[in-house]
Regions:
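Protein kinase glycine-rich loop
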Residues: 12-19, 23
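Glycine-rich ATP phosphate-binding loop
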Residues: 22-43
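Conserved N-lobe beta3->alphaC-helix segment of eukaryotic protein kinase catalytic domains
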Residues: 39-62
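A short, aromatic-enriched beta-strand patch in the conserved N-lobe beta-sheet
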Residues: 72-74
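Conserved short submotifs of the Hanks-type protein kinase catalytic core
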Residues: 79-93
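Activation segment signature within eukaryotic-like protein kinase domains
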Residues: 115-116
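Catalytic-loop of the protein kinase fold
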Residues: 127-144
Length: 507
């Protein structure tokens, strides 16, 4: 057991360990409140005095819900080691979340947006106070659950942090190699002598790698054998890649995110965005509302992100980019009713949707349905190596578990899609039937009116009504092997015919 004046902990309750300190779960001696204590080791005291106190000074300056709070600075009894008493985050770190097999292919979109919002807010507070972190990575982003069960992410570990204005530079090297800016990587990992100075944008590179890792479950730049086994190739990948190049399929949220990551993962600091532009672009994403659209031709659910002040025309264009259904051919159903979206209206008029209650999109164009497109999870199942290797076997088993969870996620998406597909087709057939009934009723009324006007010719008119009814039914539900697809397009045609029949009655 170890303790300070007000806090007590057991060395078995280790939360994390670094080169200069260890972090433990501790309790307040009086209240029993759980806290995290950072206990500095003897190696930490070999650093210059100003470096030793820098973390205390930085944390005292910060006060934000997305930054771990500092409660007190105390000392252990006998050894008089410095101890930082901080807020305890019970749900581990973002790294532990990403290490879970169900997130092997990235966080769910909703959870990723929570990470993005929290990291951006925390970093914005750092820059407002002129602080550069210098060691942004998933392991230094803690997670706890709010009162309503929502995730809250907080930046932590300010051992490498220091005050630095936008136009200032530093030459000391800190950080974790997978998340280091290439210029720092060259000097810290490859041990190549160079006298480059670094600015605040090195944090942007680390943020870009972290966000990519959270979105996809993997690092953006990985050489064969891994980044720690092939360091020279790792450096060449990051420095020789084309400007703006980044892996990732551009769909939904990713189409908004990829340009941001591409512009912060730039080696040349002159080409890299500054924090002002990064905050502006990420805020643009976070201020958008999501509209859930289920495409019947694709049998797929899409997330369309738009601003409330956008017009419906912008929404229709965004749907076109994801579904290839042109705006003039888009028709929507919502909760069983035809939903008419006027292009000039504000997007605020679009109904509130959820994943289980989306807008249902069908196309008025005679196109062949594209069907589902997904990657077979079996392709991601790794192979076990013949020789016994505990670490390799662990990684392989973890990869297999990740592929299993991906297959489960895909199966759930397919089942949900099947339900939405059946429901959408049911609504579509009901709409067709209602339109046909209205059109036939108008036609019948028109013929009755004509028969009363023609007198002796009424018998012929009755025969004509039967013929028209047969023709109408054959047009709406034509016979053939393709079944319902033949009766899909004429909704507007039937509406026009109904209007023409009404005009005949008025005459």
């Amino acid at each position: 057991m170890q303790s300070t004046v007000n806090y007590l902990w057991h060395t078995d309750d280790l939360l994390g360990q670094g080169a200069t300190a260890s972090v433990y779960k501790a309790r307040n001696k009086k209240s029993g409140e759980l806290v995290a204590v950072k206990v500095f080791n003897t190696a930490s005291y070999l650093r210059p005095r100003e470096v030793q106190v820098r973390e205390f000074e930085v944390l005292r300056k910060l006060n934000h819900q997305n930054i771990v709070k500092l409660f007190a600075v105390e000392e252990t009894g006998a050894s008089r080691q410095k101890v930082l008493v901080m807020e305890y985050c019970s749900s581990g770190s973002l790294l532990s979340v990403l290490e879970s097999p169900e997130n092997a292919f990235g966080l769910p979109e909703e959870e990723f947006l929570v990470v993005l919002r929290c990291v951006v807010a925390g970093m914005n507070h750092l820059r407002e106070n002129g602080i550069v972190h210098r060691d942004i990575k998933p392991g230094n982003i803690m997670r706890l659950l709010g009162e309503e069960g929502q995730s809250i992410y907080k930046l932590t570990d300010f051992g490498a942090a220091r005050e630095l204005d936008d136009d200032e530079k530093f030459i000391s090297v800190y950080g974790t190699e997978e998340y280091l800016h290439p210029d720092m990587y060259e000097r810290a990992v490859l041990r190549k002598p160079q006298q480059k100075a670094f600015g605040v944008t090195v944090d942007l590179w680390s943020i870009g790698v972290t966000l990519y890792h959270a979105a996809t479950g993997s690092l953006p730049f990985v050489p064969f054998g891994g980044p720690r086994r092939n360091k020279e190739i790792m450096y060449r990948i990051t420095t020789e890649k084309p400007a703006g190049a980044i892996a990732g399929t551009q769909r939904g949220l990713q189409s908004q995110l990829v340009p941001i990551l591409a512009n912060v993962l730039e080696v040349e600091q002159a080409k890299c965005w500054g924090f002002d532009q990064f905050f502006a672009e990420t805020s643009d994403i976070l201020q958008r509302a999501v509209v859930h659209v289920f495409s019947l031709p694709q049998a797929a659910l899409h997330h369309v992100y738009i601003h409330a002040h956008n017009t419906v025309a912008i929404f229709l264009e965004a749907v076109y980019k994801q579904t290839n259904v042109a705006p003039q051919h888009q028709e929507y159903l919502f909760e069983g009713h035809l939903c008419v979206l006027e292009p000039n209206l504000s997007a605020q008029h679009i109904a509130h949707t959820t994943a289980s209650s989306p807008l249902t999109l069908f196309s008025m164009a005679s196109e062949t349905p594209k069907g589902l497109a997904f990657r077979d999870p079996a392709l991601d199942i790794p192979k076990f190596v013949p020789k016994v290797d505990l670490q390799a076997d662990y990684n392989t088993a973890k990869g297999a578990m990740g592929a299993g969870y991906q297959a489960l996620r895909l199966a759930r998406a397919l089942l949900a899609g099947q339900e939405l597909m059946l429901r959408g087709l049911h609504w579509f057939v009901e709409m067709l039937q209602a339109t046909c009934r209205r059109t036939l009723e108008v036609t019948r009324t028109s013929l009755l009116f004509l028969s009363s006007s023609l007198g002796p010719e009424s018998d012929k008119a009755d025969d004509g009504a039967d013929a028209v009814r047969a023709v109408q039914e054959e047009e709406v539900f034509p016979r053939g092997r393709n079944g319902l697809r033949h009766g899909r397009a004429p909704v507007k045609q039937l509406q026009r015919r109904g209007a023409a029949g009404s005009a005949t009655l008025l005459l």
